[in-house]
Curated annotation (Swiss-Prot):
Residues 71-115, 234-255, 310-344 are annotated as: Disordered. It is found in: Cytoplasm, Cytoskeleton, Spindle pole. Part of a checkpoint which monitors spindle integrity and prevents premature exit from mitosis. Belongs to the IBD2 family. Coiled coil: none annotated. The lineage of its organism: Eukaryota, Fungi, Dikarya, Ascomycota, Saccharomycotina. This is Protein IBD2. Keywords: Cell cycle, Cell division, Cytoplasm, Cytoskeleton, Mitosis.
């Protein structure tokens, strides 16, 4: 014996929405009739189909129409004994009026809201009439505090320290503090770059004197066609240090990129990218080999080897590469001669 199917009831309104109270009452009444007529009196009943109540609003009265019975009559098929009985959904006008009054008193009706109720007031007021005046008058002493704060942040001995402080004083005296703070931050960003957060490293030429003789020779071989000998570069470096530092802001991006770079091989000394700001790229440009030497304090060995092997930018091999090729070819010929003697 298979389990009986579940019965369901669906209410559909063809005109307007159904009142919630009437719908609940019809549903309870229909379920009661189903349980009373089928489950109690006929325990063997199994295949009860779902039923649908369709309410049509005619002249202000709700008239239930049994959609299933109408469909069966249109098809010319009589209801089968397994379909069960049709539930009657009649209701008097007095009962409908009572349900409507109860719904209105509970506030569950679908009509318009009663805005005359004192509780139904506006929750959010977007008018600007009651807002206070929030105009702000800057404190004249704030400039002094900003100056002291920035002066404490700037590293002592930095070449841009005096320039930043002088620019700050001019901004504070010539404009209000509403714009002085912004101008000060922009000045520091363009002048000092990202070196304010870290102490500046003093550039000393004495640290370059401990380089091995082979490194000095390699750097001299490279520096001759570009900037003279290593000694000439050292003398020119002291001269460049006294030049204008107007191009410091242009190197801020290079400084940040250098500090964020993750070196595969850790250098012996900490890189000093601030040394590049001592030179004006428009007046006295530096090649990438000299830039490497100034930043890391040692000549770029791998770069110089590559340069000696593949030549300058013109494409011709350098003297060092030619000598290396001659030496390699000479050794190769000697090996061939030795091989012939061995065969004899």
């Amino acid at each position: 014996m298979s389990e009986p199917e579940r019965a369901s009831i669906e209410f559909v309104s063809e005109s307007d929405s159904i009142d919630f109270g009437i719908m609940m009452k019809k549903g309870v009444k229909a379920l009661t009739d189903i349980l009373a007529n089928h489950l109690q009196h006929d325990p063997e009943w199994k295949n009860e189909r779902s039923m649908k109540f369709v309410f049509k609003n005619q002249n202000g009265e709700l008239q239930p129409v049994l959609n299933r019975t109408a469909r069966l009559e249109d098809e010319g098929v009589g209801p089968s004994p397994d379909d069960g009985q049709v539930v009657d959904g009649e209701e008097t006008a007095s009962e409908q009026d009572k349900l409507a009054e109860a719904n209105c008193s509970d506030g569950s009706s679908t009509g318009d809201l009663q805005l005359d109720d004192p509780e139904s007031e506006v929750l959010f007021d977007y008018s600007l009439d009651h807002l206070p005046n929030i105009s702000y008058t800057p404190d004249p002493t704030i400039g002094k505090h900003v100056m002291e704060m920035i002066e404490s942040l700037l590293p002592k001995g930095a070449p841009y320290r005096e320039k930043v402080l002088n620019t700050m004083k001019n901004n504070v005296q010539g404009a209000g503090m509403s714009t002085a703070g912004t101008a000060a931050v922009e000045t520091i960003q363009h002048t000092a770059g990202s070196t304010i957060s870290e102490p500046a490293m003093s550039y000393e030429c004495d640290r370059d004197l401990g380089i091995a003789e082979s490194d000095d020779w390699e750097h001299q071989q490279f520096a001759q066609p570009h900037h003279g000998t290593l000694e000439a570069d050292t003398v020119a470096e002291g001269h460049h240090r006294c030049q204008s530092r107007s191009s410091e802001s242009q190197h801020a991006g290079h400084q940040r990129a250098g500090q964020e770079y993750l070196y595969e091989c850790k250098p012996k000394a900490r890189p000093d990218f601030h040394a590049l700001t001592m030179f004006d790229p428009l007046e006295q440009p530096l090649c990438m080999f000299c830039e490497y030497y100034l930043v890391f304090g040692e000549p770029p060995r791998q770069m110089i080897k590559w340069y000696n092997k593949y030549g300058s930018s013109s494409g011709g091999p350098s003297a060092g590469s030619q000598q290396g090729n001659k030496g390699w070819n000479g050794n190769k010929k000697k090996k061939k001669k030795k091989g012939k003697k061995g065969k004899r």
